[in-house]
Regions:
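Short, conserved structural micro-motifs that define repeat-unit consensus positions
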Residues: 68-74, 165-169, 179-181
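K/E-rich alpha-helical interaction surfaces of small helical-bundle regulatory domains
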Residues: 171, 175, 180-189, 193, ...
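Cleavable N-terminal export/targeting peptides
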Residues: 1-26
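Flexible, solvent-exposed coil segments and beta strand-coil junctions
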Residues: 46-52, 95-102, 143-151, 188-194
């Protein structure tokens, strides 16, 4: 995974360096959809909660709304480069139980943001329809916060990581300037598990997104 990150980062740097000199068709994109945060917080904290407390409750809501704003350049019929700002929504984790006859509980939230750069390979199917694949890298920040009835388990932390990413989708040209886009994107290792003593702070995180967007050709 380290070599994949290094390769993706190198490619991103080359893309960004070349962008000002690229002659092509520029466009903007705004998209929204659903994101799933694939993380291990519920399993890790839930195991401790179940082992130490009576009547344990371990709930997680790892799906939310996502959105991105992007700008890109269509270099030719088969290649484009894109840069995007992302909002990954938030995942929420609730744990509760009874300890020594007293209720204990915690509520954790993890919010994600990111900046991404992609190289996009395009395959026209018809004059109006094309499919594409993309690969790139994203700089992702996750803000984590836990409010717990036992103060030693409360925290507020932020972590930033470089995450390789892959995606695929389809695009339909509705008018000369306006297109409709559907795409799936996966962000690898957006978050890395970390602890502060015995307190579990940051989970391992991958993001999966499915979005629908409008692309405007400039």
């Amino acid at each position: 995974m380290r070599s994949l990150t290094t390769s993706a980062l190198t490619a991103a740097a080359l893309i960004l360096t070349a962008l000002p000199a690229v002659a092509g068709n520029w466009y903007g994109l705004i998209s929204a959809g659903l994101v799933h945060s694939d993380n291990n917080y519920k399993e890790a904290v839930g195991a401790v909660n179940t082992a130490n407390n009576q009547n344990p409750v371990n709930d997680a809501d790892n799906s939310n709304v996502t959105a991105k704003l992007a700008v890109g350049c269509r270099v030719n019929d088969h290649f484009a480069v894109e840069a995007a700002a992302w909002w990954f929504g938030k995942s929420e984790q609730d744990h509760a139980g009874i300890q020594a006859g007293q209720p204990v509980n915690s509520h954790a939230e993890f919010k994600g943001y990111g900046l991404a750069v992609d190289a996009v390979g395009i395959l026209p199917v018809t004059d109006a329809l094309s499919v594409f694949g993309k690969a790139g890298v994203a700089l992702i920040r996750i803000d984590g916060k836990n409010n717990a009835s036992e103060p030693q388990y409360s925290f507020s932390k932020s972590k930033t990581r470089l995450a390789p990413k892959l995606g695929a989708g389809a695009e339909w040209l509705m008018t000369e300037r306006l297109s409709l886009r559907l795409e799936y994107e996966h962000f690898f290792n957006a978050g890395k598990e970390s602890r502060d003593g015995q307190t579990f702070i940051m989970p391992d995180v991958d993001y999966d997104t499915v979005t629908v967007g409008l692309k405007m050709n400039f």
